[in-house]
From Swiss-Prot:
Residues covered by region (GAF domain): 1-155
Similarity annotation: Belongs to the CodY family.
Chain's role: DNA-binding global transcriptional regulator which is involved in the adaptive response to starvation and acts by directly or indirectly controlling the expression of numerous genes in response to nutrient availability. During rapid exponential growth, CodY is highly active and represses genes whose products allow adaptation to nutrient depletion.
Subcellular location per the Swiss-Prot or TrEMBL entry: Cytoplasm
GO biological process, one term: negative regulation of DNA-templated transcription
GO molecular function: DNA binding; DNA-binding transcription factor activity; GTP binding
InterPro entries: CodY (IPR014154), GAF-like_dom_sf (IPR029016), GTP_trans_reg_CodY_C (IPR013198), Transc_reg_CodY_N (IPR010312), WH-like_DNA-bd_sf (IPR036388), WH_DNA-bd_sf (IPR036390)
Protein name as annotated: Global transcriptional regulator CodY
UniProt keyword annotation of Transcription regulation present: yes
An example Gene Ontology CC term for this record: cytoplasm
Natural source organism: Exiguobacterium sp. (strain ATCC BAA-1283 / AT1b)
Length: 259
């Protein structure tokens, strides 16, 4: 397969990912196939976003990394010292992707490290490893193109997460703003009593203790539930089970109390 055909394969991956949920495992699988190497997509903190193994390495320490989906902190930190594509690193380098304790088994191994950059910042690192055979110039072109694709997907995922977070925050603010003064007071006491993200409480006891009617509590809970902020379920004489669905709620409520 020539460079153009391999580039087209990677283009196909990009077109598929552009309209779907980001799957770094699938991206790593495609890169393994195109680049014929072990492929690791590593986050800023050393987390394995996706990986695909072309040549199995029988080493317990390496297997543990893959199970935990996490490279050790010293290695992850070292990767960030690599500012540009560094190719054909041997087993004696601190940047090798092969276990140094099995030095003699991997004498011919080659590691290539490609920084993943997007939006002007370092987003992660693409680490490629072969038991033998150097990475050629064509391989490096494909590796850098792959890193660009991954960078775009990381940025897209970040943007989606930011959008989701902003939407959740807006929903909470609208729900809180819909409460009357007495309902807001009731909600503050309810979640102070709850002491976490879910639990059981008896509305009548809170109403008596705080000096408000039970209907105020019921109305306040209904407003939050209709906004999708919480879910509640009556358990009869035992009370009402409440679970917070929006993880921004307690923070916004606490911020309101602080003001």
């Amino acid at each position: 397969m020539n460079l153009l055909e391999k580039t087209r394969q990677l283009n196909t991956m990009l077109q598929q990912e552009a309209s779907a949920h980001v799957d770094f495992k699938e991206m790593a699988d495609k890169m393994r196939e195109v680049l014929e190497s072990n492929t690791f997509i590593v986050s800023r903190r050393g987390r394995l976003l996706g990986f695909a193994i072309k040549q199995q390495i029988e080493n317990d320490r390496m297997k543990a990394f893959l199970v935990d989906r996490q490279f050790p902190e010293p290695y992850a930190s070292n990767l960030f010292n690599v500012k540009e594509t560094t190719a054909n690193i041997d087993i004696d380098s601190e940047y090798t992707a092969f276990p140094v304790e099995n030095h003699d088994l991997f004498l011919n191994s080659k590691t290539t490290i490609v920084p993943i950059i997007g939006g002007g910042e370092r987003l992660g690192t693409l680490v490629l490893g072969r038991l033998a055979n150097e990475f050629t110039e064509d391989d490096l072109v494909l590796a850098e193109y792959s890193a660009t694709v991954v960078g775009m997907e990381i940025l897209r995922e970040k943007a989606a997460e930011a959008e989701t977070s902003a939407r959740k925050k807006a929903v909470v603010q609208m729900a809180i703003n819909s409460l009357s003064y007495s309902e807001l007071e009731a909600i503050e006491h309810i979640f102070e009593e709850l002491g976490g993200n879910e639990g059981l409480l008896v509305a009548s006891k809170i109403a008596d203790r705080v000096g408000i009617t039970r209907s105020v509590i019921v109305n306040a809970l209904r407003k939050l539930e209709s906004a999708g902020v919480i879910e509640s379920r009556s358990l009869g004489m035992k009370g009402t089970y409440i679970k917070i669905l929006n993880d921004n709620f307690l923070f916004e409520l606490q911020k309101l109390k602080s003001n």
